[in-house]
């Protein structure tokens, strides 16, 4: 989509004009990037998706009795619909997937509709970090979902802004399920973000391909390498693509230079404790109703209420 491309160009210019360069993680998820991420979720080292799905199966048994009236499901950064499929039931009248990659949510929505033909699906292209005006026709009770530990992918405290805007989007008497990865052994974390199949590397290096396709930067993927490591003081996995040599490129006539070994941050994945997540939710105007986790306390899904 034209607007999607313009937003991408604007963000690249803004962030590459800084001494510490970064690409916001939401731009990973064009059609090709979203499919690369699906590959990551199948990697043996990447535990997040497997554990979260097990937890969602537990939640699915409770959701029917917890919410007795007809509901609308609103998923922020929906991407693939395999997780929401676990939770859908006859009381869900509307499903509104919100994502910055319209091509991918449109494709996913068609697949979901084949399995749930009576469900009214309204795929919505948007920057879900901001307030979104939902259709008036959907049900009063709105249940939001922000899964996959995406809450950890924000820079500079933006997760609080997201949660506040999600509350405005969903409105009064709403609920939000949030998946959060928990602090654990360094070795487990670093293996998850450096899988042996190389899926995480391809996922991150795909940003170079996207820059070439959408901005005509004429960069070569082989001139970059991928690294990801744990920043212990910040309890955060940080991923970068690193320029192997000095490179230059132009955007709208403006020259940009990458030094040899210069790092471009492409992902931040904050890890939480139960108390740090509850503190975040409270400071954003949400109340933690309850949470579910696996037996090893690797991962948790929190139910928030407005």
Question: What residue ranges belong to the model's regions?
Answer:
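N-terminal auxiliary segments of SAM/dcSAM-dependent transferases
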Residues: 1-26
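Class I SAM-dependent methyltransferase Rossmann-like catalytic core
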Residues: 20-64
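Conserved class I S-adenosyl-L-methionine
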Residues: 69-79
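Conserved SAM-binding loop of SAM-dependent methyltransferases across substrates and taxa
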Residues: 80-92
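A short SAM/SAH-binding and catalytic strip from SAM-dependent methyltransferases
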Residues: 141-163
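A short glycine-rich, Lys/Arg-flanked "PGG" loop and its adjoining helix->strand segment in the class I
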Residues: 160-172
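Conserved beta-strand signature within the Rossmann-like core of class I S-adenosyl-L-methionine
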Residues: 169-183
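Substrate-binding/catalytic lobe of Class I Rossmann-like enzymes that use SAM or dcSAM, i.e.
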Residues: 190-270, 274, 278-284
């Amino acid at each position: 989509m034209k607007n999607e491309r313009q937003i991408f160009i604007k963000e690249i210019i803004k962030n590459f004009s800084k001494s510490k360069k970064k690409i916001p993680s939401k731009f990973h998820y064009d059609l090709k990037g979203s499919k690369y991420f699906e590959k990551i979720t199948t990697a043996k080292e990447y535990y997040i998706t497997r554990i979260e799905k097990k937890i969602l199966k537990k939640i699915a048994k409770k959701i029917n009795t917890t919410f007795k009236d007809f509901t609308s499901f609103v998923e922020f950064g929906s991407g693939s619909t395999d997780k929401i499929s676990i939770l859908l039931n006859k009381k869900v009248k509307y499903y509104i997937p919100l994502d910055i990659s319209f091509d991918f949510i449109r494709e996913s929505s068609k697949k979901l509709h084949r399995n749930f033909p009576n469900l009214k699906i309204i795929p919505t292209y948007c920057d879900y970090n901001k307030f979104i005006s939902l259709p008036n026709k959907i049900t009063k009770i709105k249940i939001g979902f922000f899964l996959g530990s995406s809450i950890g992918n924000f820079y500079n405290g933006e997760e609080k802004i997201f949660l506040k805007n999600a509350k405005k989007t969903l409105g009064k008497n709403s609920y939000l399920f949030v998946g959060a990865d928990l602090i654990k052994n360094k070795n487990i974390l670093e293996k998850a973000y450096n899988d042996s199949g190389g899926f995480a590397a391809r996922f991150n290096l795909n940003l170079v391909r996207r820059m070439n396709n959408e901005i005509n930067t004429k960069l070569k993927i082989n001139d970059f390498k991928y690294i990801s490591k744990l920043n212990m003081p910040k309890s955060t996995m940080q991923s970068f693509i690193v320029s192997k040599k000095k490179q230059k490129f132009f955007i709208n006539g403006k020259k940009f230079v990458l030094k040899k070994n210069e790092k471009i941050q492409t992902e931040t994945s904050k890890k939480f404790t139960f108390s740090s997540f509850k503190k975040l939710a409270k400071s954003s105007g949400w109340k933690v109703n309850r949470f579910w986790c696996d037996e090893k306390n690797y991962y948790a899904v929190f139910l928030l209420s407005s």
